[in-house]
């Protein structure tokens, strides 16, 4: 098992959550939520985080419906965000199914902090944690 550092993003048109994890432990921690204008973040802020953590790989959540079918409105935008991450920073980027990640993130946050923990930024970052930990589980089969 390698010890790569993996960063994850939960793409949204208004907010993009992020998380960081270690492949060797299969666990992730929330980082920060980036405000976005119609899906476009402040790339300087993203760059600072990528330089600080220097991930070996970036995982971006791929929005789909409950059957795994891509959504016409948001899925292409998440793919574009992933392509831009690769193009701007030269990092390997993988897409990962994010079905039900927001619901799971809300449940996790509520369990530990009640309603006060359910801010938009917290939910987006916890969703990135769920996406990354799901990606780890898929790697181990």
Curated annotation (Swiss-Prot):
Its top-level enzyme class, in one word, is hydrolase
Q: Which Pfam families match?
A: RuvX
Does the entry feature the keyword Cytoplasm, yes or no?
yes
User: Subcellular localization, per the record?
Assistant: Cytoplasm
Q: Any keyword Amino-acid biosynthesis?
A: no
A single GO cellular-component term on record: cytosol
What's the domain of life for this entry? Bacteria
Question: Which BP terms in the Gene Ontology apply to this protein?
Answer: rRNA 5'-end processing
According to the UniProt entry, its GO molecular function terms are: nuclease activity
SMART domains hit by this protein: YqgFc
Instruction: Write down the InterPro entries for this protein, in alphabetical order.
Output: RNaseH-like_sf, YqgF, YqgF/RNaseH-like_dom, YqgF/RNaseH-like_dom_sf
* Protein EC: 3.1.-.-
Q: Which keywords does UniProt give here?
A: Cytoplasm, Hydrolase, Nuclease, Ribosome biogenesis
Per the record, the similarity remark reads:
Belongs to the YqgF nuclease family.
Q: What does this protein do?
A: Could be a nuclease involved in processing of the 5'-end of pre-16S rRNA.
What is the recorded name of this protein? Answer: Putative pre-16S rRNA nuclease
- Native species of this protein? Aliivibrio fischeri (strain ATCC 700601 / ES114)
């Amino acid at each position: 098992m390698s010890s790569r550092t993996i960063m994850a993003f939960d793409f949204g048109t208004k907010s993009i959550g992020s998380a960081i994890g270690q492949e060797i432990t299969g666990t992730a921690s929330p980082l920060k939520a980036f405000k976005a204008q119609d899906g476009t973040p402040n790339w300087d802020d993203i760059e600072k985080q990528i330089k600080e953590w220097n991930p070996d790989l970036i995982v971006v959540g791929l929005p789909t419906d409950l059957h795994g079918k891509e959504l016409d409105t948001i899925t292409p935008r998440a793919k574009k965000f992933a392509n831009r991450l690769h193009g701007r920073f030269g990092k390997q980027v993988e897409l990962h199914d994010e079905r039900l990640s927001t619901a799971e993130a809300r449940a996790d946050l509520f369990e530990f902090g009640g309603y006060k923990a359910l801010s938009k930024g917290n939910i987006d970052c916890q969703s990135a944690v769920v996406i990354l930990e799901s990606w780890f589980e898929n790697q181990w089969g």
